[in-house]
Amino acid sequence: MGRAHTVSRGEDHPPIARSELPDDTAALARYLIGKLVVRDLPEGMVSGRIVETEAYVVGDAAGHGFRGMTPRNRSLFLERGHAYVYLAYGVSMMLNVSSEVPGIGTGVLIRALEPLDGIEIMRRNRGVERLRDLARGPGRLAAALRIDRSLDGLDLCRKGPLWLAKDNQKPGEIGQSTRIGITKDAARLLRFYVRGSLFVSGPRSLQE
């Protein structure tokens, strides 16, 4: 059985201090489970609880930083806690968090959120009603929060248009698996998720 869905009361969400973020990519991916992504939009605040992440570590052939820095991926090489936003397959934006010291191109992909604040705004952004489907998967998540390339390089440890925040609830049991849709370094157990959450993406076999 999954955890009961709980809606934030819209309280102020202070950003996470950078010093609290682990400086190891896999550790950061696990740490971010249960934390909040907060988006400040003209219509109001939107937020969600992180229920699924993937780590892309040093020497990882599946990572965007594997072959070095380029104009497209330079935000991945910033100090941990910055946004790396890119367009995947010409279709969907992807939100990542840079994860180590400056110059090391590693990051954590935020794969899924449990919607909290601004659910009606998310529904309009996504054009769907079903709560479970608003931010279940990285492309849906980005659409629900209206993530675009203008946010690339943003410091997520400071309040602004987008930031990371703590939550006052424990996330539940955290599972670990191989990453989704990866063909290089595919055997690594670098995906983290809340077991039994209705808001986790991927096949059922990777949700338990």
UniProtKB/Swiss-Prot annotation:
<keyword id="KW-0234">DNA repair</keyword>
<dbReference type="Pfam" id="PF02245">
    <property type="entry name" value="Pur_DNA_glyco"/>
</dbReference>
<dbReference type="InterPro" id="IPR003180">
    <property type="entry name" value="MPG"/>
</dbReference>
<dbReference type="InterPro" id="IPR011034">
    <property type="entry name" value="Formyl_transferase-like_C_sf"/>
</dbReference>
<dbReference type="GO" id="GO:0003677">
    <property type="term" value="F:DNA binding"/>
</dbReference>
<keyword id="KW-0378">Hydrolase</keyword>
<dbReference type="GO" id="GO:0006284">
    <property type="term" value="P:base-excision repair"/>
</dbReference>
<protein>
    <recommendedName>
        <fullName>Putative 3-methyladenine DNA glycosylase</fullName>
        <ecNumber>3.2.2.-</ecNumber>
    </recommendedName>
</protein>
<feature type="region of interest" description="Disordered">
    <location>
        <begin position="1"/>
        <end position="20"/>
    </location>
</feature>
<keyword id="KW-0227">DNA damage</keyword>
<comment type="similarity">
    <text>Belongs to the DNA glycosylase MPG family.</text>
</comment>
<dbReference type="InterPro" id="IPR036995">
    <property type="entry name" value="MPG_sf"/>
</dbReference>
<dbReference type="GO" id="GO:0003905">
    <property type="term" value="F:alkylbase DNA N-glycosylase activity"/>
</dbReference>
